[in-house]
């Protein structure tokens, strides 16, 4: 190979590598960080490529003998076509928000995106006047081709250089977002979207921003590619190309942008280059077919043997306290641990970590319902529940299994919407207010089932719940650490303080997913407190927590109530109710059976029959 | 009216396929995107047997058998081990896409890219109510009706069917109530796999000629039919298949054949956007 042809070869590798890396980076922020399984990712690259092509080409009717048909043809100079491609890549994401918005399960949304990719390909292929149909658009001008000779080795290498620089810039941009408080919220959403929502994260907003950002990056990658190869056709963007990109980031390491780049080099680029050097064998369709088989196989093997890829997502060490040896929590060792390691919730004042101003208790009605009902496919689970929760009190809620306690809690917090009835929070009708907005307004819930963000550390779990973080927005994250850094440090310190208070400091930098059941309950309580609630809804917070520790937490909850917080707690352990809760609401078969102090309830024969002895 | 006839036959093939697909999803909670590739592999098994001089109507059983065995193996070797790891549901969907690539292109690597056709007579052409249907097409519609009645009988009147429905509604509760859920899940893969194999073979019969990637877009029709009737609802799937089958063929006749799948896409996207639990389903099923 002569030096010049080697140079041409290198420039091709550089451009293809950069294009693949850009695409993988876009997918990495969507899938690896925000948890959006965008099976239609290739649409966005295609949109960028077509846009760059038709913006840079002269009018279809007058150019090239008019042998191809397409819209626009504005003949714009570089870099306008690339900028246009980036913008269109982002804009085209907006119609897909309905699929990735809050309501739809992730796998259904993924299917919707996959199908959209197939549909759009079919439409573009069959409708010739739009983008020249199946034949595609060719003779796309190279950027600045009237100033330089695109065939020269210098131009080609410079093109490769520009592509690489763009990739590096995008990499740093994404890292800036991922490592910010906003990135933490994105990863929380990825790990458990319902819980992130209950902590006040706007899922639709977050997903829209990231889908648009990923789309812009994909659009740019398409523009870079089409400027180099000068043609673009439906055959280049079959839905299966998205699977190749997924294979790349799964192999390289989803959630780690370095892994995405490595994956881009190994899979799309690597496969292309290896087959280039293979001696021809078999029928012409054999090698591509085997490539697809290999990609399918690699996806399965990696997901099984190395699900975090070659470069796994790194664990973020946040703790500012002198590092002790990292403790790996032992999830099977529930009893021993709760008795010894944790449970030193001693003289720590929970109130001190909250930034809300002290409140004088006036026991006004904070939260109330009117005829709240819920039925699932005809089965009524909650019917006509009207309750009032008073400020500064620790209200208990008991009832046999299936009484509708968790359903009521979920409706109060907005996780479920009631079939009928109304909910008032501080006098406002919030029946139709989204759950994340209720959380932001101070109505925060915990969950009956484990709800930690598994792949966030304990400290990250806590810090991400803190409201009003200036770095917890898309624009805030772009402004960088200088903008949000010091605030984040003080947030981390607050989280460490409460962690210390619960005696869990040694687990600060461990993944929350590795904690024992009891420890996870504690993390959840701490996290809910850090969300600065005015009304805290606790769904069986003591389940799996050691009895002594549960009593200590109960005492602290009483203290918090005295200091002005309002708490509603569902609990099965009646001794806890006896000791801490006043009043207590009894639910049975979806209705309010009685309300009063535990002593009064024990005297009520109906209640005793329904629950206390049952 | 002739497009109604085409629609009916398309719907018949689709109904067999969708009922199997939706049962897999309902009982085993796997959105098996490799379903189409199992279909076409089964169609090829029928073809190989048919090539050895055996009537296609007997060879069909080989295709059915292949569908059942391959599906059972897929579940045993791949899907169940992945599900046991308690990963996000999307992981299994991605895995099924990997399986789909391997199934489709593995077949293409073996048989090459050329089109094949079954050795069979299309039978007399029948003409009634303005529709033209060949003997083969009538038989396919008959098979479809028979299969749907069998599935109805299975789900409504047999212990196995009731156990399948129980497992679908709540797997843990079913297990705690004494249902052998692992066995039920295996049986579901075998039965739905058999339907998949049958659907692949009748699909190939109906297309006349086919090759390894012939039903690449078929998964879209399947998904559209499933979501129209409600994911995991066998009766909904029957309705969905009829609606999608008829509407694609009728729109092909009145608009243009190039866009005949478009209506299925739009139905699917519309359902996902507004009623992801199907026309008759309710929120709780998700």
Question: Which ranges hold each PLM region?
Answer:
Chain B
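Membrane-interfacial amphipathic/re-entrant helices at transmembrane-helix boundaries
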Residues: 1-16, 45, 54-59, 85-91, ...
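Inter-helical junctions in multi-pass inner-membrane proteins, predominant
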Residues: 1-13, 155, 188-225, 232, ...
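Membrane-embedded helix boundary and interhelical linker motif in transport proteins
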Residues: 5, 27-73, 77
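Short, non-helical or kinked segments that cap or interrupt transmembrane helices
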Residues: 21-42, 56, 86-90, 160-163, ...
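Alpha-helical transmembrane segments within multi-pass membrane transporters and channels
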Residues: 54-99, 239-244, 275-276
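Transmembrane helix-bundle core of multi-pass membrane transporters
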Residues: 81, 88-157, 184, 250, ...
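Cytosolic-side transmembrane-helix boundaries in multi-pass membrane proteins
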Residues: 110, 169-176, 180-183, 255-286
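Helix-loop-helix "hairpin" substructures at the membrane interface of multi-pass membrane proteins
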Residues: 132-210, 234-240
């Amino acid at each position: 190979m002569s030096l010049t042809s080697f140079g041409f070869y290198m420039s091709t590798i550089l451009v293809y590598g950069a294009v693949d890396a850009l695409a993988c980076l876009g997918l990495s922020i969507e899938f690896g960080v925000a948890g959006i399984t965008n099976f239609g990712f290739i649409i966005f690259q295609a949109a960028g490529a077509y846009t760059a092509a038709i913006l840079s080409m002269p009018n279809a009717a007058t150019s090239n003998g008019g042998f191809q048909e397409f819209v626009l043809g504005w003949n714009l100079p570089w870099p306008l076509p690339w900028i246009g491609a980036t913008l269109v890549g982002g804009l085209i994401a907006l119609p897909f928000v309905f699929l990735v918005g809050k309501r739809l399960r992730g796998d259904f949304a993924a299917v919707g995106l996959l199908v959209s990719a197939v549909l759009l390909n079919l439409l573009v292929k069959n409708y010739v006047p739009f983008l020249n149909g199946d034949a595609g658009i060719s003779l796309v001008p190279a950027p600045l081709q009237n100033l330089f000779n695109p065939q020269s080795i210098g131009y080609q290498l410079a093109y490769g250089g520009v592509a690489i620089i763009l990739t590096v810039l995008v990499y740093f941009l994404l890292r800036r977002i991922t490592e910010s408080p906003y990135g933490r919220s994105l990863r929380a959403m990825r790990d458990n979207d319902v819980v992130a929502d209950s902590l006040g994260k706007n899922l639709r907003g977050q997903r829209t921003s990231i889908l648009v950002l990923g789309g812009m990056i994909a659009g740019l990658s398409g523009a870079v590619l089409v400027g180099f190869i000068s043609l673009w056709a439906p055959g280049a963007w079959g839905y299966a190309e998205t699977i190749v990109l997924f294979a790349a980031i799964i192999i390289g390491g989803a959630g780690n942008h370095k892994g995405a780049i490595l994956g881009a080099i190994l899979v799309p680029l690597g496969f292309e280059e290896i087959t280039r050097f293979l001696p021809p064998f078999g029928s012409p369709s054999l090698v591509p077919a085997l490539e697809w088989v290999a990609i399918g196989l690699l996806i399965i093997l990696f997901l099984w043997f190395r699900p975090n890829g070659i470069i796994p997502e790194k664990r973020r060490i946040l703790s500012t306290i002198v590092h002790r040896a990292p403790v790996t929590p032992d999830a099977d060792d529930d009893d021993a641990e709760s008795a010894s390691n944790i449970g030193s919730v001693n003289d720590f004042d929970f109130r001190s970590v909250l930034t809300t101003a002290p409140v004088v208790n006036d026991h006004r009605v904070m939260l109330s319902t009117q005829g709240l009902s819920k039925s699932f496919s005809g089965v009524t689970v909650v019917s006509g529940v009207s309750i009032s929760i008073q400020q500064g009190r620790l209200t208990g809620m008991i009832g046999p299994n299936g009484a509708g306690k968790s359903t009521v809690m979920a409706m109060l917090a907005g996780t479920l919407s009631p079939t009928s009835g109304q909910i008032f929070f501080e006098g406002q009708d919030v029946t139709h207010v989204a759950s994340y907005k209720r959380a932001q307004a101070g109505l925060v819930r915990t969950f009956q089932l484990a709800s930690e963000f598994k792949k966030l550390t304990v400290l990250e779990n806590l810090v991400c719940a803190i409201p009003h973080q200036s770095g917890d927005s898309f624009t805030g994250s772009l402004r960088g650490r200088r903008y949000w850094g010091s605030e984040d440090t003080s947030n981390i310190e607050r989280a460490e303080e409460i962690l210390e208070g619960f005696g869990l400091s040694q687990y600060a930098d461990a993944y929350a997913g590795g904690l024992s059941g009891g420890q996870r309950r504690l993390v959840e309580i701490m996290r809910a407190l850090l969300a600065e609630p005015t009304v805290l809804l606790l769904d069986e917070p003591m389940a799996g927590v050691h009895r002594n520790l549960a009593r200590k937490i109960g005492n602290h909850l009483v203290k918090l109530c005295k200091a002005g917080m309002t708490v509603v707690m569902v609990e099965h352990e009646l001794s806890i109710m006896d000791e801490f809760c006043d009043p207590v609401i009894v639910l049975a078969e979806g209705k309010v059976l009685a309300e009063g102090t535990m002593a009064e309830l024990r005297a009520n024969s109906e209640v005793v029959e329904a629950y206390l002895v049952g | 009216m002739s497009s109604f006839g085409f629609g009916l036959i398309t719907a018949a093939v689709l109904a067999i396929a969708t009922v199997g697909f939706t049962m897999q999803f309902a009982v085993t909670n796997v959105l098996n995107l490799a379903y189409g590739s199992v279909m076409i592999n089964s169609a090829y098994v029928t073809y190989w047997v048919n090539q050895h001089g055996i009537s296609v109507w007997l060879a069909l059983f080989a295709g059915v058998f292949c569908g059942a065995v391959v599906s059972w193996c897929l579940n045993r070797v791949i899907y169940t081990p992945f599900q046991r790891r308690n990963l996000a549901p999307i992981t299994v969907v991605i895995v099924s896409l990997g399986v789909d690539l391997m199934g489709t292109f593995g077949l293409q690597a073996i048989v090459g890219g050329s089109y094949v056709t079954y050795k069979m007579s299309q039978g007399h052409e029948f003409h009634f109510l303005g529709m033209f249907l060949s003997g083969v097409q009538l038989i396919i519609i008959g098979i479809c009706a028979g299969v749907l009645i069998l599935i109805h009988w299975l789900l409504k009147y047999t212990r196995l069917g009731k156990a399948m429905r129980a497992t679908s509604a709540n797997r843990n509760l079913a297990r705690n109530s004494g249902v052998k859920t692992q066995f039920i899940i295996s049986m579901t893969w075998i039965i739905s796999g058999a339907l998949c194999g049958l659907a692949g073979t009748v699909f190939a019969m109906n297309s006349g000629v086919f090759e390894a990637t012939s039903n690449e877009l078929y998964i879209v029709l399947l998904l559209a039919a499933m979501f129209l009737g409600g994911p995991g609802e066998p009766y909904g799937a029957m309705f969905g298949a009829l609606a999608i089958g008829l509407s694609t063929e009728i729109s092909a006749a009145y608009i243009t054949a190039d866009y005949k799948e478009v209506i299925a896409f739009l139905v699917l996207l519309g359902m996902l956007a507004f009623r992801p639990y199907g026309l008759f389903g309710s929120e709780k099923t998700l």
